[in-house]
Amino acid sequence: MLLNDLIQRQQTRWKASFLVVSILMVATCILSLSIGEMWILPWSPDGALEQQLLTQLRMPRLIAALAIGASLAASGAVLQVLLGNPLAEPGVLGISGGASLALVILLFALPFVPTPLLTMLAAMLGALIFTLILVGLSRRRKVSTARLLLIGVALGILSGSVVTWAFYFSDDLNLRQLMYWLMGSVGGVSWQQLSVLLFVVPVLVWLCLQGKKLDLLMLGEIQAKQLGLDVAALRWRFILIVSLLVGASVALGGVIGFVGLVIPHLLRMSLGAENRYLLPLSALCGGLLLALADTLSRVILPSAELPVGVVTTTIGAPIFVWMLLRSHID
């Protein structure tokens, strides 16, 4: 009876968290659509100008922020299980850097502006290559947590330096303006660019429903196989899905760090490690955090707009340092 009560209490906590996060997300969405240089009531815009600002600027960037935040948070939660590393995250491990590197190479290689689908495929390929490197090292070499983080940071620095050199030697103003975008920004996202969400949303929903399989994977590879799980196929499927989500996120909003690290880790600490609840709640919280960060980036400075990646890094970096100290990594 005591065990049943404990399980029931834990499920109640998860359900209450879903409810609270959903309410906060609705409030944040209304605030994000309303606030700016011109205050607009989303349900009753006054005039053609307010209508255009709402539908062509604020709504696309809000949808992009929600999708990117959800994708990065869910990807971070999956990576932490796949790598057996509570500090794994697409930005910290350099996966986002690989996506941005592939995207910049594509922009330099093509004589025309690539379509949103082509940019997503290029970013996905870069993310996939870096993910395979990290997964291969973590499984075959059995590197420690500290060394894996260092390898990821090194890969991120390497890709970042190549991107910086490329922009420095570029005479194209549009390419140089991309440097601001690569710092993380959903400003200027159009409805055409959001067409990639036709691929991203179904994949994200599928990923959020794989929590039970991840719970089995956390028991260990041998135990998971004994319970009928095809571990190798599932691992490859997760790698491809994470690469697609990270690649699409970078293609839409540039490199936005720490969302995939902070959200899953804090949820595990406060609510537990049941992935069937953790994955969808991480996605919701990730979307909420990035929508809130994007709203703050527009109002912190009166005459300028900060990249949303700067806001998330400001929030996430101190938490990351605290997590490193807490895990006693030498």
From Swiss-Prot:
Protein family:
Belongs to the binding-protein-dependent transport system permease family. FecCD subfamily.
Q: Which organism is it from?
A: Photobacterium profundum (strain SS9)
Q: What is its main location?
A: membrane
Q: Which locations, inside or outside the cell, does it occupy?
A: Cell inner membrane
An example Gene Ontology molecular-function term: vitamin transmembrane transporter activity
Gene3D superfamilies listed in its UniProt record: ABC transporter involved in vitamin B12 uptake, BtuC
As recorded in Swiss-Prot or TrEMBL, the protein's gene is named: btuC
Gene Ontology process terms (BP): cobalamin transport
Q: Name one Pfam family in it.
A: FecCD
InterPro entries tied to this protein: ABC_BtuC-like (IPR037294), ABC_transptr_BtuC (IPR023691), ABC_transptr_permease_BtuC (IPR000522)
Q: What is this protein called?
A: Vitamin B12 import system permease protein BtuC
